[in-house]
Every structure is written in structure tokens, then in C-alpha cells.
């Protein structure tokens, strides 16, 4: 079952999986070039790796039958009306904790849960598939394809990753109490992953219209205009506290 088309060819204006992966990683990297000072190095690497991995599950033949039916038909595989396991679930159980920690010297064990949860739930899907069903599905429709896509032999999935998830989107899994720092890490990864994913899926290259942070033309223009004028008390106060976070209550017309 040839999966090369996922990397090298286009069909019906669909971007290939490899192209989408490269585009979203580039989008993330461009964002961090502009706004990287607001994030730690670990946070940036967690987001970029999540962008790289989150759509691996799309290599499964049921998904490919939807976006590229001609290629699946050419392979000789019959996918019929089989129910598709969400690709985010497959992506999240394709990487082991050991493999995850090898991605960066900055990654540690407590990063793994937020990371795989962000990938697993990067789309909101009902979470009703347990390990045995996922493994059976993968044997039929995914292991061979993801092995070829990644260029390495993947014999099984790490369905025990479901035990590392911060939550499950179903009615029968007990809700756990999550430490705020762990939950915030998950929100950061998932939020930026979705931001960059939606950006490139909409056909854009950059996720933010970059403000004039370098030359600060608007700021300089305002300062030039005010240079010959006497600042009002509120304006003077704001100028003197420009490096602080402020909440100011002032009447209309204060400047």
C-alpha cells in the first residue's frame, strides 16, 4: 500500500500531509521569531513538536480514502464504509514517552501528559475508543502507512498513552484533579497548535499581522505630535509608567 503520495504528490488541490506538516511548523517558527521573548525555550519546543506530530494519524487509509480516494483505490485496499478512528487519537499514541524525551533535552516526564493530551484532543471528538480497538484498527489501516511515512518500522501503538491524558472526552472516565501548572502547559500547547493549524488550513503563512515592534513608527509619530504640547496628568502618568502593567480609571478626554 503505497503511501508516498502523502509526501510527494497533490490531488484535487489537497495539500499533502508532509506539506501541511512543514507549513504548520514553519508558521510556528515564524511566530516565535517575532514573539519568542514571551515564551520559554521549552514552551516553544513543545509547541513546535506538537505541530510536527499532531497530524500523523491522517496517514491511516480510512482518512486517505476520504481525501484521496483515487490513491487508496489504486493501492488495492478496500476501506468501504468503515468507521474512522479520529486521527488525533492515532497521532497521540504513535509516540512513546521515551521517544518524546529524546526530542529535546529540555523535555521531562511531567511534560508528556500535557503534550499528548494537546495532540489527542486537538480536535473535539467523542473519546470512545480504547486500546484494543485502536490496535486492531491500526493493524488494518495505519501501522504500515505510518511506518512508510516516517521511514521507520512501527510495529505497535502506545495506547497506554491514554492513561497519561489529562482528561477523556467521554461520560464514563472519572475526572481527575489537575495541577494548575500542568493544565496551563496543556492549554498553551493546544492553543498555539490550533492557532497555527487553523492559520495554514485557511491558506495563510503567518498567524499574526505583525505590529510595528521594531521601528515603532506609530509611537514615534504620536510622540512627535505631543512634543510641543503640555501633557495632561493622565498622559504624563502613563509615560512615566510605560514599563508597567496598568489599569487606569480616568474620565473621557484625559488623553
What are these regions (language model features)?
Residues 1-216:
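Accessory nucleic-acid engagement/destabilization modules that flank
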Residues 17-21, 224-244:
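N-terminal pre-P-loop "Q-motif" helix
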Residues 168-169, 221-226, 250:
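Short linear motifs at secondary-structure transitions and domain/linker junctions
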Residues 214-219, 242-245:
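A short mid-domain helix/strand-loop element embedded in enzyme catalytic domains
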Residues 242-255:
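Walker A/P-loop
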Amino acid at each position: 500500500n503505497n503511501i508516498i503520495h502523502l509526501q510527494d504528490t497533490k490531488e484535487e488541490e489537497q495539500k499533502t500531509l508532509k506539506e501541511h506538516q512543514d507549513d504548520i511548523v514553519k508558521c510556528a517558527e515564524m511566530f516565535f521569531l517575532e514573539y519568542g521573548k514571551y515564551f520559554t525555550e521549552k514552551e516553544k519546543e513543545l509547541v513546535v513538536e506538537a505541530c510536527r506530530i499532531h497530524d500523523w494519524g491522517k496517514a491511516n487509509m480510512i482518512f486517505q480514502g476520504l481525501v484521496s480516494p483515487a490513491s487508496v483505490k489504486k493501492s488495492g485496499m478496500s476501506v468501504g464504509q468503515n468507521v474512522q478512528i479520529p486521527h488525533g487519537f492515532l497521532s497521540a499514541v504513535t509516540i512513546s514517552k521515551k521517544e518524546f524525551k529524546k526530542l529535546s533535552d529540555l523535555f521531562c516526564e511531567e511534560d508528556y501528559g500535557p503534550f499528548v493530551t494537546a495532540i489527542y484532543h486537538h480536535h473535539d471528538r467523542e473519546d470512545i475508543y480504547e486500546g484494543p480497538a485502536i490496535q486492531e484498527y491500526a493493524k488494518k489501516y495505519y501501522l504500515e502507512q505510518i511506518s512508510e511515512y516516517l521511514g521507520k518500522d512501527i510495529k505497535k501503538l502506545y495506547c497506554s498513552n491514554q492513561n497519561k491524558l489529562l482528561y477523556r472526552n467521554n461520560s464514563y472516565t472519572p475526572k481527575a484533579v489537575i495541577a494548575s501548572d500542568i493544565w496551563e502547559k496543556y492549554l498553551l500547547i493546544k492553543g498555539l497548535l490550533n492557532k497555527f493549524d487553523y492559520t495554514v488550513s485557511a491558506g495563510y503563512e503567518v498567524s499574526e499581522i505583525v505590529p510595528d515592534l521594531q521601528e515603532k513608527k506609530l509611537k514615534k509619530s504620536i510622540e512627535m505630535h505631543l512634543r510641543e504640547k503640555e501633557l495632561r496628568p493622565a498622559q504624563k502618568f502613563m509615560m512615566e509608567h510605560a514599563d508597567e502593567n496598568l489599569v487606569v480609571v480616568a474620565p473621557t478626554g484625559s488623553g
